């Protein structure tokens, strides 16, 4: 958005039949998280032509057994366009009995000339409320506590639990 204090509409962009979250990436690209068709996908679009958006990259993360809380809580998604990294909260359930097998987040890099690359993942206790970075560190706040780690070693997050 070239002028965030004075936004203006540029038209209607039809990208999916499901729920979709849009994240601007420069002037003419967007990254989307899409749960249409019982699948969770991340996509990158060139929207320089508003009437003809071009899908640049798409990655399916899983079927109906994987979900993301970004549709209910957009603050759970962290996107650092300067470092070309985003963090997406995910929950994976067993297809057999519906029990949660993974609750946490995936970390991706994105480059418009190369696509997406999953850099790692970290698990959390509780539902992710927000993810942010400060001074090169990655922080994740859930309804049960706060964790801190690095983008290079997300599986080594350490945290403290909130006391009730």
Can you describe what each PLM-predicted range is?
Residues 1-164:
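Feature marking well-ordered beta-strand scaffolds used for ligand recognition
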